[in-house]
Amino acid sequence: LLQVPLEKGQSAREYLQEQGLWEQYRLKYPYNPMAKFDPSFAVAGEPMTNDADLAYYG
Protein backbone atom coordinates (compact mmCIF):
# COMPACT_ATOMS: atom_id res chain seq x y z
CA LEU A 1 0.00 0.00 0.00
CA LEU A 2 1.42 3.35 -1.03
CA GLN A 3 0.23 6.69 0.31
CA VAL A 4 0.12 9.48 -2.24
CA PRO A 5 -0.12 13.00 -0.79
CA LEU A 6 -2.90 15.14 -2.22
CA GLU A 7 -2.29 18.69 -3.32
CA LYS A 8 -5.01 21.30 -3.67
CA GLY A 9 -4.88 23.19 -6.92
CA GLN A 10 -7.26 25.42 -8.81
CA SER A 11 -10.25 23.74 -10.34
CA ALA A 12 -10.85 24.25 -14.05
CA ARG A 13 -13.81 26.47 -13.16
CA GLU A 14 -11.69 28.66 -10.85
CA TYR A 15 -8.95 29.01 -13.45
CA LEU A 16 -11.35 29.93 -16.25
CA GLN A 17 -13.21 32.39 -14.01
CA GLU A 18 -9.90 34.01 -13.10
CA GLN A 19 -9.12 34.40 -16.82
CA GLY A 20 -12.64 35.69 -17.54
CA LEU A 21 -13.39 32.74 -19.82
CA TRP A 22 -15.82 30.63 -17.75
CA GLU A 23 -19.05 31.89 -19.36
CA GLN A 24 -17.63 31.48 -22.86
CA TYR A 25 -16.47 27.93 -22.04
CA ARG A 26 -19.79 27.03 -20.38
CA LEU A 27 -21.75 28.15 -23.45
CA LYS A 28 -19.44 26.41 -25.93
CA TYR A 29 -19.30 23.13 -23.94
CA PRO A 30 -22.57 22.68 -22.03
CA TYR A 31 -22.48 20.21 -19.13
CA ASN A 32 -23.73 16.87 -20.46
CA PRO A 33 -21.69 13.95 -19.06
CA MET A 34 -23.82 11.34 -20.87
CA ALA A 35 -23.02 12.75 -24.33
CA LYS A 36 -19.93 10.53 -24.64
CA PHE A 37 -21.70 7.27 -23.69
CA ASP A 38 -24.13 5.03 -25.52
CA PRO A 39 -27.58 5.65 -23.95
CA SER A 40 -28.33 1.90 -23.98
CA PHE A 41 -25.76 1.49 -21.17
CA ALA A 42 -27.56 3.92 -18.84
CA VAL A 43 -28.30 2.11 -15.58
CA ALA A 44 -28.11 4.84 -12.92
CA GLY A 45 -30.33 7.77 -12.10
CA GLU A 46 -27.62 9.76 -10.29
CA PRO A 47 -25.80 12.49 -12.23
CA MET A 48 -22.07 12.13 -12.72
CA THR A 49 -19.63 14.54 -11.08
CA ASN A 50 -18.89 17.88 -12.64
CA ASP A 51 -15.16 17.70 -13.39
CA ALA A 52 -14.90 21.48 -13.59
CA ASP A 53 -15.11 21.60 -9.79
CA LEU A 54 -12.39 19.05 -8.99
CA ALA A 55 -9.54 20.65 -7.08
CA TYR A 56 -7.55 17.84 -5.39
CA TYR A 57 -4.91 15.91 -7.30
CA GLY A 58 -2.54 13.15 -6.28
Swiss-Prot record:
EC number(s) given by UniProt: 3.4.23.-
One BP annotation, GO: proteolysis
Gene3D superfamilies recorded: 6.10.140.60
Top EC class of this enzyme: hydrolase
Any one GO molecular-function label of the UniProt entry: aspartic-type endopeptidase activity
Domain of life of the source: Eukaryota
Key words of the record: Aspartyl protease, Hydrolase, Protease, Zymogen
This protein's record includes keyword Lyase: no
S-S pairs: none
Propeptide residue intervals: 1-41
Short name of any one Pfam family annotated for the protein: A1_Propeptide
Family label: Belongs to the peptidase A1 family.
UniProt protein name: Pepsin-1
Lineage: Eukaryota, Metazoa, Chordata, Craniata, Vertebrata
